[in-house]
UniProtKB/Swiss-Prot annotation:
One of its GO terms (molecular function) is DNA binding. Coiled coil: none annotated. It is an enzyme of class 3 (hydrolase). This is Putative 3-methyladenine DNA glycosylase. It comes from Clostridium novyi (strain NT). It comes from the Bacteria.
Length: 201
């Protein structure tokens, strides 16, 4: 499997977001975990009131967003849940794509142990359905921590590979950004229509 190259990530953020759907995230730690991206949200940087970098806020936390596309940006919500973002666009254009949900592809027991401490077939139906259908959940299941912040998808132990398949993309409002005034209405959340791993339809 070949990693996506830098040029994939340095394009328009909306296009990157839509094109990430169906691609495979690979995390290599003790084992190799593969998850198909089924839901994303685009964040348009300086002019997007929902983005951490809105108004050109360059801080210790957001400085990785100012790198060229293809770097990992991990932040925490509620002081405990990690969220995986893919930096997009050109250098000094602080935009990113939030990975909201993935479908486990390989070594699903490892996903399950990371998330619940037991094998997948020991989980309840509810737990199986909720294993990776949200940004914090997928980070727990794939063991993506703050240590991943700043890693390079083009050379480090987390990367994304191409995957050819056809599906219908749904565009909708982003989730949990009611504070963002007009930006809360942007249709910048994209997901694979028939995926059962999408967080919310």
């Amino acid at each position: 499997m070949k990693r996506l190259n830098r040029e994939f990530y340095t394009r328009d953020t909306i296009e990157v977001a839509k094109d990430l759907l169906g691609k495979i995230i690979v995390v290599e730690n003790e084992t190799k975990l593969l998850g198909k991206i089924v839901e994303v949200e685009a964040y348009g940087g300086i002019s997007d009131k929902a983005a951490h970098s809105y108004g050109n806020r360059k801080t210790e936390r957001t400085k990785i967003m100012y790198e060229e596309g293809g770097y990992v940006y991990v932040f925490q919500i509620y002081g405990m849940y990690n969220c995986l973002n893919i930096v997009s666009s050109k250098k000094d254009v602080p935009e990113a794509v939030l990975i909201r949900a993935v479908e486990p592809i390989e070594n699903i027991d490892d996903f399950s142990k990371n998330r619940y401490g037991k094998d997948f077939n020991e989980l309840t139906k509810y737990q199986q359905k909720n294993i990776t259908n949200g940004p914090g959940k997928l980070c727990m299941a794939m063991n993506i921590t703050k240590k991943f912040n700043g890693l390079d998808l083009c050379k480090d132990n987390i990367y994304i590979v191409d995957n050819k398949e056809e599906f219908e993309i749904v565009a909708s409002k982003r989730i949990g950004i009611d504070y963002a005034e007009e930006a809360k209405d942007y249709l910048w959340r994209f997901y694979i229509k028939d995926s059962k791993y999408v967080s919310k339809k």
